[in-house]
């Protein structure tokens, strides 16, 4: 139907007769001449209709925004003074000779260039119109390029694209499963996969050596700006490769991706132990663009006559830490109060601070409600350790180590954003040497990653001291966002059973939920490992989007609903009866 895309035309097409198809982006009537900006996925072309061609002129006069049209015309240079340098097609225009309306359109609920004044709920309800916006179309096209580059790299390195089941069984992987009732096995349920984890391990046992998949995954959890109930990951697994080899290969893949699509050189990724990340940045995904660091001062505060500090300082599970903000004296009392409210989200009971007005005067040069509780020698040691200068502000966290890390880690990132402290645009790294387990609130233990991650020690040492054992896990982090996480997997059944036992999974549960895996590990499972990248988050970062909803064609809301299709929805009594399911209405208390 067409000879060219709208956005393809340029000065090289001058004097050519062309045919275009697309949507009317804008219609203008200038002194008896009608201008139509016609849009398709490649861009916009200006088309001119003059009264000399009465039939096409009359049609052009009748069209409105978002009409679908087909037109023929002659490409010509724009008159002097009308060139638009902001458009790819800004040097030319098309003199329209024929026009056909392929479909009329109702007035859209919002104009494409006015989307910022429209609520997101309106845009998502009319997503088929929202997706016409050039900005969103560019992001969708960029996403397609990302998957194309990644596929090419993996194909070129001997990986096989193999699909794994979507209907599987529920396994404990950290989040709630989406369940699908079985009609043929009444009373039983499938689960949608949270990841292809077990199947890709079985593919390694089967001898496929290198596997990848652009996989849909599902998790029924509370949503944030970077989470969706269904999401896409680039899933990778390989046999006979070490932790270092897997990291080097996937780093090369991401470096190549950024270079090819954005001409950005990410360089070599530094590697940081988990303990250092938590101690210095309060996060296992530190944003290294921000130069602020967290410094432990528990030893300085252990003997002070201030229980808010001395209590956590002497508690084996507590921590007192400081965060220096260079030039932070300029922060107002209201700003400090706002930051105090912010850290309360993470369980902090308050946010102590000291303003350094004159570091040479330890008696009167420090401004703070808490400074009176700190002996002069503690003040001096504190300023020396933090390398504080006049004009700096020091925030403190004092609580359990977990709360201090989370609160000051989040505050560090918020300060970096609020005060624009970024020192570079891109800061990748690997976080390594994760603990195998962490303690739960009820005194039990849970896997930091998942129960199939291999430890760095023997089963005997793991049993003897599970909370000090390290895992062979690694996370790729970019700008404070986890791009991908992976590990070497357990490939021996005895080790897998040991991990299950430590997680208090009984023999019966092991057999019921993981019997197929334990059996497979007894039939010659090779050493193997892998990694999964969050595709949505990767594209979000690369396109500078604030939410992954901007890089997914049909996203869900933060309440896990689709405003376009009104999913999830009720089903008929007939369907429920076929599944032998009865809906129990919630009891409303009067």
From Swiss-Prot:
EC number of the protein: 6.1.1.23
GO cellular component, one term: cytoplasm
Keywords: Aminoacyl-tRNA synthetase, ATP-binding, Cytoplasm, Ligase, Nucleotide-binding, Protein biosynthesis
Residues bound to ATP: 219-221, 228, 482, 534-537
A UniProt-annotated Pfam family: tRNA_anti-codon
Protein's UniProt keywords contain Nuclease: no
InterPro entries: Aa-tRNA-synt_II, aa-tRNA-synth_II, aa-tRNA-synth_II/BPL/LPL, Asp-tRNA-ligase_1, Asp-tRNA-ligase_1_N, Asp/Asn-tRNA-synth_IIb, AspRS_core, GAD-like_sf
SUPFAM superfamilies xref list: Class II aaRS and biotin synthetases (SSF55681), GAD domain-like (SSF55261), Nucleic acid-binding proteins (SSF50249)
Primary residence: cytoplasm
Any one GO molecular-function label of the UniProt entry: aspartate-tRNA(Asn) ligase activity
Reactions the enzyme catalyzes: tRNA(Asx) + L-aspartate + ATP = L-aspartyl-tRNA(Asx) + AMP + diphosphate
Transmembrane segments: none
Region annotation (Aspartate) ranges: 197-200
Localization (cell): Cytoplasm
GO biological process terms held by the UniProt record: aspartyl-tRNA aminoacylation
UniProt-annotated site: Important for tRNA non-discrimination, residues: 30, 81
Superkingdom to which the source organism belongs: Bacteria
Protein family (similarity comment): Belongs to the class-II aminoacyl-tRNA synthetase family. Type 1 subfamily.
PANTHER family the UniProt entry points to: ASPARTATE--TRNA LIGASE, MITOCHONDRIAL, ASPARTYL/LYSYL-TRNA SYNTHETASE
HAMAP family recorded: Asp_tRNA_synth_type1
Assembly information from the UniProt record: Homodimer.
Function, in words: Aspartyl-tRNA synthetase with relaxed tRNA specificity since it is able to aspartylate not only its cognate tRNA(Asp) but also tRNA(Asn). Reaction proceeds in two steps: L-aspartate is first activated by ATP to form Asp-AMP and then transferred to the acceptor end of tRNA(Asp/Asn).
Classification via NCBIfam families: aspS_bact, PRK00476.1
The name this protein goes by in its record: Aspartate--tRNA(Asp/Asn) ligase
Lineage, uppermost ranks: Bacteria, Pseudomonadati, Pseudomonadota, Gammaproteobacteria, Oceanospirillales
